[in-house]
Design a protein with these regions (language model features):
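Feature 926 captures the class I aminoacyl-tRNA synthetase adenylation module centered on the KMSKS loop
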Residues: 1-229
Length: 229
């Protein structure tokens, strides 16, 4: 099955899964946890339909974006190749995020059902899964970024990286590596660190990867601009 078809299927799967799962949940379930895994909000089980609806909308939007990104009326073969490359990257992003949120939704439903019947409910498992998922997602997206070509839709996009094709190539190669490293460290944190720290570690590492990549993009921009003097 081609990536784009699987990605489309994946955007609808969370909705079907949730509709089935909700039949087995009590009417009132945990719907929110703080960063320590403690339940701080209860509500209707139908609240869990929000994420699948958002995923459906995002899936349709991203699918249309990928389709438009891969087609052009130009006869320039190089530009067409760049557009097709970016379309594949977008499809990969849709696939990766779809897998992440599908897994997250499944765990949220499982934890909600378990905690609704537990005398000492906890969201510790959910925190680890979120951190682990974010780490794996970062690794996957980090591998995709260097495959993108200069555009305004996907990749490490800022004014400095958009300066030239070379600035884009170098910035996205470095940014991809930074994401991979932060993702691997996040996975380790999700496995080894206390639950209360797992998501914080993921957020801190992602922020550091972004800051370092921005600094590198600025450096590359200056180097590229200096060549024109």
């Amino acid at each position: 099955m081609k990536t784009r078809h699987f990605a489309k299927l994946l955007t609808g799967f969370p909705m079907a899964m949730t509709l089935i799962w909700l039949q087995f949940l009590p009417d009132r379930v945990p719907i929110h946890y703080n960063f320590s895994g403690i339940i701080d909000g209860w509500g209707s089980k139908w609240t869990y339909l929000i994420l699948p609806v958002v995923l459906l909308v995002m899936g349709f939007v991203m699918a249309g974006t990928a389709r438009r990104a891969g087609h052009t009326s130009t006869q320039n073969a190089q530009k067409q190749a760049h557009l097709e490359s970016n379309a594949k990257v977008i499809q990969g992003v849709v696939l990766a995020t779809g897998l992440f949120f599908t897994g997250l939704q499944a765990v949220m439903l499982y934890v909600a059902g378990r905690n609704a019947a537990d005398t000492a409910p906890s969201g510790a498992l959910l925190l680890r899964v979120i951190a682990l998922g974010l780490g794996l997602l970062s690794v996957f997206l980090g591998n995709l970024m260097p495959r993108s070509r200069r555009n305004s839709l996907v990749g490490f996009r800022c004014a400095w990286s958009q300066y030239s094709d070379e600035a884009w190539r170098r910035t996205n190669r470095f940014g991809g590596l930074a994401l991979i490293v932060s993702g691997l460290l996040t996975v380790l944190g999700a496995i080894l660190a206390p639950e209360a720290w797992a998501v914080w570690i993921a957020l801190i590492l992602s922020t550091l990867a972004l800051i370092v990549s921005l600094c590198y993009a600025r450096r590359v921009y200056r180097e590229e601009k200096a060549k024109e003097v």
